[in-house]
């Protein structure tokens, strides 16, 4: 996949070991490590670091960027008895504490990754110097289930690819052109490695009750055409009152940083400068 190969040119793959298994980081921009706060990227559900494939090379111009495969996703092992964000969060905390010791990090958390960070920040607020939440769930604003399709054993390869395309368009993208053959390949690769099968927490409003425990600045970025918030996007800053800023990227779907990377970078750059 050319997009992935291009992003990996200057990356270092780091394997971090724990008693319960290994996690994998991809790290860029280590020349900035001594002079800047580490920037940690947490991907969305059924994903990997590749959710940030269109962003890492830009972000690494000024930061040391650490993109994690969350435990149970991508190349990282699944800890015991973990199936959703609530049981995952303590293990992510352990990963961050081992990687950065007592140093607080800046966080970019997309969707499920942002939810996990929000749960973690309520218990360990000093882990984060700043959190930038991107299209996060668990705000109690989902109105209905998306029209996602499942696979059957009778489907051939082209039928399976059609299901992946449909699901990407139902949840992740606003534009048909975004669901290219390369991105369908990427989706297939990521979904096949997802061992976190529950999304119960995402449909609750758990973050609303925890947000007052967050002690760092918190910012929100959403795509204007996020399928999860079609009728409720304007309510996000109303219910998530801890946000220091709320920005909407025009003409972008849920996977906003992939679909409109330039507009996304303009917003993130300003936040990271501060």
Give each language-model segment a name.
Residues 3-23:
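N-terminal cap/lid segment of alpha/beta-hydrolase-fold proteins
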Residues 24-75:
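Conserved HGGG/HGGXW glycine-rich cap/lid loop of the alpha/beta-hydrolase fold
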Residues 26, 53, 66-108, 266:
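Active-site loop/oxyanion-hole signature of alpha/beta-hydrolase fold enzymes
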Residues 109, 113, 117:
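Gly/Ala-rich beta-loop-alpha elbow adjacent to hydrolase catalytic centers
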Residues 118-122, 128-159:
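Flexible "cap/lid" loop of the alpha/beta hydrolase fold
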Residues 144, 158-216:
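Conserved alpha/beta-hydrolase catalytic His-Asp/Glu region
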Residues 219-252:
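Conserved loop-alpha-helix segment in the C-terminal half of the alpha/beta-hydrolase fold
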Residues 252-261, 265:
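Catalytic histidine-centered segment of alpha/beta-hydrolase-like enzymes
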